[in-house]
From Swiss-Prot:
This is Tubby-like F-box protein 3. Residues 387-406 are annotated as: Disordered. Pfam families: F-box, Tub. Residues 56-102 form the F-box domain. Residues 387-403 have a biased composition (Pro residues). Belongs to the TUB family. Expressed in roots, leaves, flowers and seeds. CDD domains: F-box_AtTLP-like.
Length: 448
C-alpha cells in the first residue's frame, strides 16, 4: 500500500465518526463560544451529560518505527501546497501521530515551509526567503496574504495564509489580522493581532495575542476593559494584546520618486538574533486567537499609547513608546529597557529601509528586488537590520554585528494594480512581515 493511499484512508476515516460523537464535540464548542441557536442548542443540551465516545482510528496503533518512516517520506514527497495538506491530515489523526509530526516536521526557520497554523508566528528561513503576495480589495478594505506557488510574480491561486481588514476611525486607522479569509471582524475568535496607526499615518503599533519572551523590552500590556453588561468574552480567555513592534515613517526628501524612510522596532525580537549564532527566543508552540473588539480600551494601551491628537509636535505615546519628533538615530539609541529590579533587558532588533541607488540610464532611484517587483511605487521597500549601538556605560569591545548588514530581511513591492509581493526571512515571521507591509498601504499625510 502506498503512503498516499494510507493518508487517503486516514482522511476518509474521519467520516466514520458517529453523528452522536460529532454533536457532542459540537456541543462543547458551543459551550466555549457561548453562541446558541434554537433547536440545535436544545438537541445539544440533551447530550451534555453523555460522555464523548469517539472511536479510535485503526491506524493509531501502528508501530512507532513505521509511523516515523511514513511521516519522513510524506514530509519529503509532499513539500509544496496543495499536496502538503496530506502532512496536516497525518497530524490530525490522533495524539500519537501528532507528536510524531512534531518530531519530524521542522519549523520554517529550518525547513523553509509553512505547514501548520503556528508556522505563521514562527521565524522564516535563515537561508532563502518565503515568497508571498498580498491581494488588495479596495471596495471591501481587505487584504489577503497568500503563499506563492509559482515563480511568476503575477500568478494567482496561492495558498491562503492571513487576511486583514481596515477600520477607519476619527483619529486613527486599525487593521484587524485574522486567520480566516472571510467575515473579518474585531469580535471574531480567529483574530491573532492588530495594527494601529496615529492620525497622520506615520506611526504604527503592532499588537499580538501571543505573549513575547521574558527578556523582551515590551511596553505596557493592553488588557480589555469590558462593559459590565457584556457577555461575549469568557473569563477563561481574557482579551490581552501585546505591543510587539513599532513602525515609524519619516519625511521622504525624494517625495514620491523614492521609497519611504521607515524604521521598525521589533520589541519581541532581540538584536542579537541577527548576529552569528543568534536565536529568536520564546517561539510559540500554538496559536492564541482572540476577539479584539474591546482590547484597545485599556487605559494603559490606549490612552497612554495614543494621546490626544491636538498637538502633534509633542509625543503621542508614553515614554516607553516615544516616537515624538526625535530622529531615528535617537530612537535606536534609547530603546534599552530594564525591569523593576534594575535588570537590563536585551536590546530589541531595529530594521531600517535600504536606501535606493540612482540609476543613470533610467534617471530614477532604484532598488534591486531581483525580479520580484515590476511596478515603481512609493510603497515599495526593502528592510535590513540597523546597526546596534553598544549599551550606555558599557565597555566597547568588538561586539559582533549582523552577519550580513545588507541582507534583505523583508521586501515588499507592487506587481499589479492591487497585487503586491511580500518576501520575508529570519528573524521575522509571516504575521510580523504582513503587519509591517499593511502599514505601507496607509496614507502618509506628513511624509510625501
Amino acid at each position: 500500500m502506498s503512503f498516499r493511499s494510507i493518508v487517503r484512508d486516514v482522511r476518509d476515516g474521519f467520516g466514520s465518526l458517529s453523528r452522536r460523537s460529532f454533536e457532542v464535540t459540537l456541543a462543547s464548542l458551543y459551550g466555549l463560544t457561548g453562541h446558541h441557536k434554537g433547536k440545535t442548542q436544545s438537541s445539544l443540551d440533551e447530550l451534555d451529560d453523555s460522555p464523548a465516545i469517539i472511536p479510535e482510528s485503526r491506524w493509531a496503533s501502528l508501530p512507532p518505527e513505521l509511523l516515523r518512516e511514513v511521516i519522513r517520506r510524506l514530509e519529503a514527497d509532499e513539500s509544496t501546497w496543495p499536496s502538503r495538506r496530506n502532512v496536516v491530515c497525518f497530524a490530525a489523526v490522533c495524539r500519537t501521530w501528532r507528536e510524531m509530526c512534531k518530531e519530524t516536521v521542522l519549523s520554517p526557520e529550518f525547513c523553509g515551509k509553512l505547514t501548520f497554523p503556528v508556522s505563521i508566528k514562527q521565524p522564516g528561513p535563515r537561508d532563502g526567503m518565503i515568497q508571498c503576495y498580498i491581494k488588495r480589495n479596495r471596495s471591501k478594505s481587505t487584504y489577503h496574504l497568500y503563499l506563492c506557488l509559482s515563480n511568476v510574480v503575477t500568478a494567482e491561486g496561492g495558498k491562503f495564509v492571513l487576511a486583514a481588514k481596515r477600520h477607519r476611525k476619527t483619529t486613527c486607522t486599525e487593521y484587524t489580522i485574522s486567520m480566516v479569509s472571510g467575515n473579518i471582524s474585531r469580535s471574531s475568535r480567529t483574530n491573532i493581532g492588530k495594527l494601529r496607526s496615529n492620525f497622520l499615518g506615520t506611526k504604527f503599533i503592532i499588537y499580538d495575542t501571543q505573549p513575547p519572551y521574558n527578556g523582551a523590552v515590551v511596553p505596557h500590556v493592553g488588557r480589555t476593559s469590558k462593559r459590565f453588561n457584556s457577555t461575549k468574552v469568557s473569563p477563561k480567555v481574557p482579551s490581552v494584546t501585546y505591543n510587539i513592534a513599532q513602525v515609524s515613517y519619516e519625511l521622504n526628501v525624494l517625495g514620491t520618486r523614492g521609497p519611504r524612510r521607515m524604521r521598525c522596532m521589533m520589541h519581541s525580537i532581540p538584536a542579537s538574533s541577527v548576529e552569528p549564532g543568534g536565536i529568536v527566543p520564546g517561539q510559540p508552540e500554538q496559536i492564541v486567537p482572540r476577539a479584539l473588539e474591546d482590547s484597545f480600551r485599556s487605559t494603559t494601551s490606549f490612552s497612554q499609547s495614543f494621546r490626544s491628537t491636538t498637538s502633534f509636535s509633542k509625543s503621542i505615546m508614553d515614554p516607553s513608546m516615544d516616537f515624538s519628533s526625535a530622529r531615528f538615530s535617537d530612537i535606536s539609541g534609547s530603546i534599552m529597557g530594564g525591569d523593576d529590579n534594575g535588570e537590563i533587558k536585551e536590546r530589541p532588533l531595529v530594521l531600517r529601509n535600504k536606501p535606493p541607488r540612482w540609476h543613470e540610464q533610467l534617471q530614477c532611484w532604484c532598488l534591486n528586488f531581483r525580479g520580484r517587483v515590476t511596478i515603481a511605487s512609493v510603497k515599495n521597500f526593502q528592510l535590513v537590520a540597523a546597526p546596534s549601538p553598544p549599551p550606555a556605560g558599557a565597555p566597547t569591545p568588538s561586539q559582533p554585528g549582523p552577519a550580513d548588514p545588507e541582507k534583505v530581511i523583508l521586501q515588499f513591492g507592487k506587481v499589479a494594480r492591487d497585487m503586491f509581493t511580500m518576501d520575508y526571512r529570519y528573524p521575522l515571521s509571516a504575521f510580523q512581515a504582513f503587519a509591517i507591509c499593511l502599514s505601507s498601504f496607509d496614507t502618509k499625510l506628513a511624509c510625501e
